[in-house]
Amino acid sequence: MIRNIALIFFLLILSACSKQSGEDEQHKGYYYTGSLFDPYIAQGSIFTREVKNMPLATNSAAIAAYMPKMPAEYLPERFKKTVLTTLSTTSYNIPIYVVDSNNPSQEYANFESKDNRVIYKKDLVQYTTGRIPLPKYAQPAGGGDKSFAVYDRATGIMREYFYAVKDEKGTWHFAASGYFKAKPNFKDLGKDNFTMQHTTGGSAVVCMLNPLSQIGIAEARKGEICHALSFTIANAGKGFSYPAKQGDGTSTNPNAPLEGQWFRIDPNIDLNKLKLRPFTLLVAKAVQKYGGYAADKNLFCHTFTAEHPINEMVQGKPNPWEKGGDIYEKYNGIDLNDFPWHLTQWAPVDWGK
């Protein structure tokens, strides 16, 4: 009798272990646990071009002097003297969902649009509407843009959506989209798409693969960002600059840079001597080496964007950007308000085209 009880107990344990193993395998099928930022998938693109020999626009110094002053023209009175530069981690950034349409466990969703920005472009209808691989937990970033990206490892199709809203039946309705068709697993992405532009359309105004110029979670943990960074500018000048494909700036100030216009921090400055906050120093070093560009405007302040933490949080992990999260604690905060805009240098419009 004792042997029978022991056998039953053993079988119950074995069954539980098998069930847990199956759940783990299913979990892996739904959730991509790797990183697009380490190793960086856009190596060899314009995002990893070093800028030490970047030429300067004739009004570069004037732009640098204006950048710290610009937000005060748009901020509410209570923020004018205290807010200059922020970091978006869960709102107004672009979550990236890496999917695998070859995986039998991959979930899908239907996508529809009635917006003229989509329906009159045959390839956008072909590549960004219909049945698209997407995990059920997917959601857009908070804030008004409601954007997210879906990158399919199997096909190499990189889809991005703007103002995506899911109805009660699970169908996503969106206002704008963009795509680029890379090789499977995004092999040679930097070689095949040096400019990091969408083939057609876009989720951000510059119509680029903007999510890959966000600050990656893996990079922040590692302590080094190895690519250029995009930011949302308080306002931009009218027009746009390569590699952007369009812009929506409304500023008439001659020293408001254009969206897409490249900038850097003076390479002759020793950033370690500036007494910047640790996280600001991380960002400043990336901008000094690889540069950056304005990808959108917000009529508020200057805002860098970070990789959205949803893919980690759905696995039960804490938000690394929040107080108590590992990145926040590593840098003793992620405040970027001391970013040295006055030390930036700006390239001529369309530099590198």
Give a label for each model feature.
Residues S18-Q20:
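Bacterial signal peptide processing site
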Residues I2-I8:
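Sec-dependent signal peptide recognition
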Residues D24-K353:
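Short, surface-exposed polybasic-aromatic patches that bind anionic ligands, especially phosphate groups
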Residues I13-A16:
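C-terminal motif of bacterial Sec signal peptides marking the signal peptidase cleavage site
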